[in-house]
Regions:
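Hydrophobic, well-ordered secondary-structure elements that form the walls
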Residues: 69, 179, 204, 269, ...
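Mid-domain catalytic core of redox enzymes
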Residues: 41-169
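Beta-rich nucleic-acid/ligand-interaction surfaces
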Residues: 35-54, 218-231
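Flavin-binding catalytic cores
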Residues: 109-110, 149-151, 170, 189-230
């Protein structure tokens, strides 16, 4: 949430969109001499010789490394390293995602039926719950895992992106609402689940006065998140947040006393994606903590 405050933001929103953070970090890294290899495909990694082979613009390239940090999903590094034992062990974790996202575009600012006198309250987060008890909440969560239900209403978290951008004095052609949805079964794409999108709209539009101003909606299911962003099973946090996969258990290091972020039994390969800390696949928090640990490790040698 604080990332928005750093880059001309407000309560987690970032002026111009969250991708502005990576643009600003890129500027910082370039200024201190970091080299970038964009649009590149890693062919192989030789962990003994500490060499990375990759293709860029159909040309073979090779670079050396002293320390290697992966900010990907947890499985991909094991595949690139061709470490089948480690891959098999990591794949035993629960990667299932049951969250979807709908972006609704309005041609005029959204007007809520239950307004607030507080300044800028239109930009606040909202939660719409479909369950009345914790027991029902749990049943709804499990329903899309154990049964054939494609959608079992749990809650909808509403990001008032359009109102937030107005607070930040950023003019955009449409007013956006983003609905983060629970619970959607992993399997079908958003295009195949139009009835789910319509159900979510039905729930949300009860709270909005000017529903006629909604001109378009885009729906991403867990399957879409897998196909577009390569999350193993459509989980934006890469792994499920459940038993033995929370915070201090969320690592792949065989020597956590040396470093929580070491990857497998490698001495100089690290992992800092959302699989190590549930931060919506943004490696900012884990990247920083991993870098701090690595710096201490280097300084101690």
């Amino acid at each position: 949430m604080d990332s928005g405050s750093v880059f001309n933001g407000y309560w987690g929103y970032v002026k111009g969109g969250i991708w502005q953070i990576s643009h600003e970090i890129t500027k910082i890294n370039k200024k201190i001499g970091v080299h970038f290899h964009m649009s590149s495909n890693i062919s192989s990694i030789d962990s003994n010789k500490m060499k990375i082979s990759f293709k860029k613009e159909n040309k073979n390239n090779e670079i050396d490394y002293d320390y290697l940090i992966f900010a990907t999903d947890p499985i991909t590094p094991s595949k690139i390293l061709k470490n089948k034992d480690l891959q098999s062990k990591i794949e035993d974790n629960d990667f299932l995602g049951t969250s979807g996202k709908i972006t609704a575009f309005f041609k005029n600012p959204v007007i809520w039926k239950e307004s607030s006198p507080y300044k800028n309250s239109d930009s606040s987060f909202r939660f719409i719950f479909s369950n009345q008890t914790l027991s029902d909440f749990e049943k709804s969560s499990q329903s899309v895992i154990r049964n054939s239900n494609n959608y079992s209403p749990g809650y909808i978290q509403v990001y008032a992106e359009g109102a937030a951008q107005r607070v930040l004095n950023n003019k955009e052609p449409f007013d956006k609402l983003i609905f983060f949805i629970k619970n959607i079964k992993y399997g079908k794409t958003g295009d195949q689940l139009n009835h789910v999108k319509e159900k979510v709209k039905e729930i949300m539009f009860k709270y909005i006065k000017n529903t006629e101003d909604c001109v378009s909606t885009e729906f991403l299911s867990p399957r879409d998140l897998n196909q577009i962003f390569y999350f193993p099973k459509g989980n934006i946090d890469h792994m499920a947040l459940n038993e033995n996969q929370n915070y201090n258990d969320r690592h792949f290091s065989k020597n956590i006393k040396k470093s929580f972020y070491l990857y497998g039994d490698y001495e100089n390969i690290f992992y800092c994606g959302a699989g190590a800390y549930p931060c919506g696949s943004v490696a900012g928090t884990t990247g920083y903590m991993c870098a701090k640990q690595l710096k201490r490790l280097i300084d101690s040698n």
